[in-house]
A protein has these predicted regions:
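Alpha-helical transmembrane segments of multi-pass small-molecule/ion transporters
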Residues: 1-309
């Protein structure tokens, strides 16, 4: 228990620090957008390639992990549709509930998994991301298409998925690993320094994107989406990992990813495709704040449950 709390509190401390820094105008509004771009397009991809290329992937059960990820997305979708009568005020609002129920924050996930589980955490997390990001984007686009009836920008989504730097870097890292090429020794010291920058800057950017003002008008929606994403999803992940006989450490990484708050990019997708962007912003902020308590709690609870079985 102490180990989990000790490992996770710096992650959430950096998120809060990012929030405080932006609200106090430090180091300037223009900094945060550029910081997020640098993290997303350079620092995180370098981290993923370097870790995946050098990690022993024989300890990762790719088949079981893939099946668990697909089933988790399906279960999250079912949960979201089941609570629809109790939540969204309109069709656009439901798209925000849906995204809040299934998507996950990559920055928090990579930082927490690296802190808790080291290279194995990054490796399993990268496999989860490589599978889940395209699948979730496809599901979200289908939900938007059905509920908002907007088609103008949907053609750009497949290309955006293919060009996603996190997917590309995961595939490059896995290729270097599986072909035996490994990571080039010449650039390894540079990659190591860039990798160390990725997690703190990414977490600061998450905090900088939070806004408490948006929480005022979406209380019911935040509660339902958070209940699904932060409680039902990790419990479902626990059951699936048990069902497929996944090793304990890989299972813990999957629990963690299932328990993550929804992605900050959900707001952008809601704005682009006709969803309820203010509600989405409220869910992102609410879940990020709640997850500071829920993630340590659920990880400790599931760890205890696993040992008792």
């Amino acid at each position: 228990m102490i180990e989990i709390i000790s490992a996770l509190w710096p992650v959430f401390a950096l998120i809060l620090l990012g929030y405080v820094a932006r609200r106090t105008g430090f180091p300037g509004e223009s900094f945060w957008q550029q910081a997020e771009k640098a993290t997303y397009f350079v620092l995180f991809p370098v981290l993923l390639v370097s870790r995946l290329a050098t990690t022993d992937m024989s300890v990762v059960d790719l088949k079981a992990t893939g099946l668990i990820v697909c089933l988790l997305v399906l279960m999250g979708s079912v949960f979201a549709f089941l609570v629809r009568p109790f939540t969204a005020r309109d069709a656009a609002g439901f798209t925000s509930i849906y995204q809040g129920s299934v998507r996950f924050n990559v920055y928090v996930g990579l930082a927490a998994s690296a802190t808790l589980f080291g290279s194995l955490g990054v490796a399993v997390g990268a496999v989860v991301m490589a599978l889940m990001i395209p699948l979730l984007n496809l599901c979200c686009v289908l939900v938007f298409s059905f509920f908002t009836h907007k088609t103008g920008k949907f053609s750009a989504i497949p290309l955006a998925i293919i060009k996603n730097p996190l997917i590309i870097s995961s595939l490059i890292g896995l290729t270097l690993n599986q072909t035996g090429i490994g990571f080039p020794l010449v650039i390894e010291p540079v990659a190591e320094l860039l990798s160390r920058m990725a997690l703190p800057l990414g977490l600061l950017s998450v905090g900088a994107g939070l806004s408490f003002r948006v929480l005022l008008n979406s209380g019911v929606e935040i509660c339902w989406a958070s209940f699904i994403k932060l409680m039902l999803m990790p419990l479902s992940a626990f059951g699936l990992c048990l069902l497929f006989g996944l090793d304990s450490q890989s299972a813990e990484v999957i629990w963690l990813y299932a328990a993550l708050p929804t992605a900050t990019s959900s707001y952008i997708l809601a704005r682009q495709l006709g969803g309820d962007a203010p509600m989405m912003a409220a869910i992102v902020t609410g879940q990020t704040l709640i997850s500071m308590i829920s993630i340590p709690f659920i990880m400790i609870f599931l760890g205890f449950l696993q040992k008792s079985l």
